[in-house]
Amino acid sequence: MKVTKKVLDQSLCCTALLALVGGAAAQCALPSSYSWTSTGALAEPKAGWAALKDFTNVVFNGQHIVYGSVADTSGNYGSMNFGPFSDWSEMASASQNAMSQGTVAPTLFYFAPKDVWILAYQWGPTSFSYKTSSDPTDANGWSAAQPLFSGTISDSDTGVIDQTVIGDDTDMYLFFAGDNGKIYRASMPIDNFPGDFGTQSEIILSDTKENLFEAVQVYTVDGQNKYLMIVEAMGANGRYFRSFTADSLDGEWTVQAGTESQPFAGKANSGATWTNDISHGDLVRNNPDQTMTVDPCNLQLLYQGRDPNASGDYNLLPWKPGVLTLQV
């Protein structure tokens, strides 16, 4: 599919028109079912890399800042960011900058109370770790690693995997997966962050391994007093996302779009022709801060996809970035 700004900005256009009616900003509820349009693959891995994956994205000073994991041609993992760009159509020409130290499966956000940027990740010195910076565009300008979570889980081949961090007015929350059909949560007072969530966590969702696999993300839904969780699942037709909602970050989560035939995002509703898989990514947020706020009038999902005909070692599969835009 040819990438055009017109296609990518269609929801923003509609939102702007609605906002003009009555002179107030439009507010939208989350849809009861989802239908998307998709770009094609937006970037190719640079020489020596086989895959670009596990994306986290913020918009800062009008530009996208994207971090992700890479797999090299031997299947070894590393980390990278893209040089800042204003429009998704510019991602292909943005620089791909290797990080000197791995921050695999990252989460990037600005922690407003302390005026500091946070990059949380796995496979560091502790179960989950984080680094800080004053400049999120500099791939190698991050601090030394600090402990984010030091606990372990049982009944998991991978151990803790794929964290995300989000805050409300009083607390910060850590959510993560285990490739084992469970989603976990830990919390701390917001005044103690950045810091270590400790060793304890609780299981908040439990299902089959296939239904709750990995890549959990949690967001504040703008204007709705609601939170949205998406979790990657394994289906007959590839990876897809299921969604859940809650009234509070410490509350109960209720499935919203939970089947492969009617997912949050997957082959059944993505509109993508270049990939069957809609895998590990990040919704585009309203602002870069710890609230992880998304606009339900203008949902876009940065995801990883791959050629359906590619096979072999998972770590060598040719994952690339694409973007879904919700049809409204």
From Swiss-Prot:
Glycosylation sites: N309
Taxonomic superkingdom: Eukaryota
Catalytic reaction list: Hydrolysis of terminal non-reducing alpha-L-arabinofuranoside residues in alpha-L-arabinosides
Signal sequence annotation: 1-26
One GO cellular component, as annotated: extracellular region
MF term (GO), any: alpha-L-arabinofuranosidase activity
Subcellular location: Secreted
EC class of the enzyme, as a word: hydrolase
A Pfam family hit: Glyco_hydro_62
Chain's role: Alpha-L-arabinofuranosidase involved in the hydrolysis of xylan, a major structural heterogeneous polysaccharide found in plant biomass representing the second most abundant polysaccharide in the biosphere, after cellulose. Releases L-arabinose from arabinoxylan.
Family: Belongs to the glycosyl hydrolase 62 family.
Protein's name according to its UniProt entry: Alpha-L-arabinofuranosidase axhA
Organism: Aspergillus sojae
